[in-house]
């Protein structure tokens, strides 16, 4: 790599990520090439490989890093009315919004690319798994706050967060499998499951 400052390197890397995100969204993973990325970014194709080892790695960086950043922000919205189940659903669903704005085709490609990368580079699979664990941890902390605030009676928040995460994975899978299923159905189904899990623990309200 030519001797350029760290700041300039960061600019180039971010440009590659930005352009790649645009192309992946518009034409999909398979029809996007490192050549088309370099052309759109205004750089030599070889420059891309100074920052990423493959198109798969770019794809991972574009979508999973964005999702991780959203998870890192945590679940911070407070309960503002008596409809606690709806508020809990909204808060938990909120982290998923950025990912679900992607076309279903891109989301399916994310799964396929993840499996492909996991076989070649286990460290990327571990990174992906760490995002899921972080999400469950944030849900657990969120439930703990509601217990401390006397919105919910005591239960094992770690186990509950794992069950909720399993429900989320199932609903996302159904959303991707059912071509005509809208995001609103995913959210409503998640609301029903959260209601089933937590309605017996609500203190007052509904």
Predicted segments with their positions:
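Solvent-exposed, amphipathic alpha-helical segments
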Residues: 15, 19-27, 74-77, 163, ...
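N-terminal intrinsically disordered/low-complexity leader segments
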Residues: 1-11, 205-206
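Generic hydrophobic, amphipathic alpha-helix propensity
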Residues: 12-21, 37, 62-66, 70, ...
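Hydrophobic alpha-helical connector segments
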Residues: 61, 75-105, 160-164, 187-190
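Amphipathic alpha-helical segments used for helix-helix packing
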Residues: 100-126, 173-177
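Amphipathic alpha-helical packing segments from all-alpha helical-bundle domains
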Residues: 122-149, 158-162, 188
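C-terminal peripheral helix-coil segments that are non-catalytic and often amphipathic
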Residues: 90, 94-101, 137, 141-148, ...
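Helix-turn-helix
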Residues: 15, 23-57, 61-62
